[in-house]
Amino acid sequence: MKLSDFSFVLPENLIAKYPTQQRTASRLLHLDGKNGKVEHTMFADMLKFVEPGDLLVFNNTRVIPARLLGKKETGGQVEVLIERITSDTTALAHVRASKAPKPGTKLILEEKVNVTVTGRDDALFILQFDHDETVLTLLEAHGHMPLPPYIDRPDENSDKERYQTVYNEKPGAVAAPTAGLHFDDSILNALKEKGVNLAFVTLHVGAGTFQPVRVDNIQEHKMHAEFAEVPQDVVDAVLNTKANGKRVIAVGTTSVRSLESAAKASAERGDEQIIAPFNEDTEIFIYPGFEFKVVDAMFTNFHLPESTLMMLISAFAGKENVMNAYQEAIAKEYRFFSYGDAMFIERA
């Protein structure tokens, strides 16, 4: 398949720069992958799409304030985006500077954080933080929320709360699992009251999620690696749900990728069950032709043209159905990307 198959033109004014005042105040487009039918509603009404006994699977990663601005000791400006914390005092990071820093280069970030570049790991730089406090403590104190490049504004205090799900638990992401941003405590309680079961996986979203696909033949694209964990209690909940003839509904593409990574690993080992616990990096790339083993429906935001996430939802609901739904969303002026509106998609 060609990259251009997943292209569409999005008017600039439809890119949401800020979230809605209330988390549940977004619009919700319902797409039935079986027939391509589209329905327009509000996220606050999402309960009508779920039934008692269904399982909703959320990603409980916590976004770390991973962006640090500063300068080299010699004076040149630098911008650091932590990709992964590797120990209490080290991290892998993207570093933007007029000249790539060499090993031994010292950086002064946010006027208080002293860092030494110790080497490279592919496109990433290995950083040593020269402090007694942990990297995470330093980031929580001095870092900026790593807003995506298309939210073209400086981060604000409100982003510390709003670019984070209400159920976040495990620090490690440098981008939010954005479908989850629409859920607040009252809607989570309403789901439980309705008899819907909730489960939590972890996938630490990396900055690679914003990297463009650079090949024309999408099968040649190499996915970035992200850490994912699907614990035993989630496996049990999935198997239980399937046994009862109910649906597994993923909240976000990261939950889809976590569950299907666990299922893929299970199949490769020749397990009898469709899914088993998973606790490692995943490079799963889901595009049309992929056979879903676990996920029956999903909540997701609107994605960038030609992105791997467009390919994932096209695999899930049919490319033509997705492209038609997107054209309708654009015509009706839905808000796009991380702080934008949501979709509820049922599998083709």
UniProtKB/Swiss-Prot annotation:
Its main location: cytoplasm. Pathway: tRNA modification; tRNA-queuosine biosynthesis. It holds the Pfam family Queuosine_synth. InterPro entries: QueA (IPR003699), QueA_dom1 (IPR042118), QueA_dom2 (IPR042119), QueA_sf (IPR036100). It catalyses: 7-aminomethyl-7-carbaguanosine(34) in tRNA + S-adenosyl-L-methionine = epoxyqueuosine(34) in tRNA + adenine + L-methionine + 2 H(+). It is found in: Cytoplasm. Transmembrane segments: none annotated. It comes from the Bacteria. One of its GO terms (molecular function) is S-adenosylmethionine:tRNA ribosyltransferase-isomerase activity. Keywords: Cytoplasm, Queuosine biosynthesis, S-adenosyl-L-methionine, Transferase. Its EC number is 2.4.99.17. GO terms for biological process: queuosine biosynthetic process; tRNA wobble guanine modification. One of its GO terms (cellular component) is cytoplasm. Belongs to the QueA family. Monomer. This is S-adenosylmethionine:tRNA ribosyltransferase-isomerase. It comes from Alteromonas mediterranea (strain DSM 17117 / CIP 110805 / LMG 28347 / Deep ecotype). The gene is queA.
